[in-house]
Amino acid sequence: MAKKSKIAKNEQRREIVARYAARRAELKEVLRRPSSTEAERLAAQRELRRQPRDASPTRVRNRDQIDGRPRGYLRVFGLSRVNLREQAHAGHLPGVRKSSW
């Protein structure tokens, strides 16, 4: 089980990312657009640097929905490998069965 403070901090980061997402996309579009001038690019870079670090989606960590485990995360289920196995054996994941060949 992950510390509650780590889980809370990650949720706070998700909120910050959502709050700044539209503005970050606009600034990145200015940087990507070939028609933008050098001054526009520099201004966009400067504004991106002024934003909080936690506004970057890279800082958000995928965590298990049950216990917050950060490693061994499977996106399809939103669970770590440990909890995926437990849930599958208990029959709580429809359509998931133990492999045999």
UniProtKB/Swiss-Prot annotation:
GO terms for molecular function: rRNA binding; structural constituent of ribosome. Pfam families: Ribosomal_S14 (PF00253). One of its GO terms (biological process) is translation. It comes from the Bacteria. Keywords: Ribonucleoprotein, Ribosomal protein, RNA-binding, rRNA-binding. InterPro entries: Ribosomal_uS14, Ribosomal_uS14_bac/plastid. GO terms for cellular component: small ribosomal subunit. Residues 31-67 are annotated as: Disordered. Disulfide bonds: none annotated. Residues 38-53 have a biased composition (Basic and acidic residues). Binds 16S rRNA, required for the assembly of 30S particles and may also be responsible for determining the conformation of the 16S rRNA at the A site. Belongs to the universal ribosomal protein uS14 family. Part of the 30S ribosomal subunit. Contacts proteins S3 and S10. This is Small ribosomal subunit protein uS14A. It comes from Streptomyces coelicolor (strain ATCC BAA-471 / A3(2) / M145).
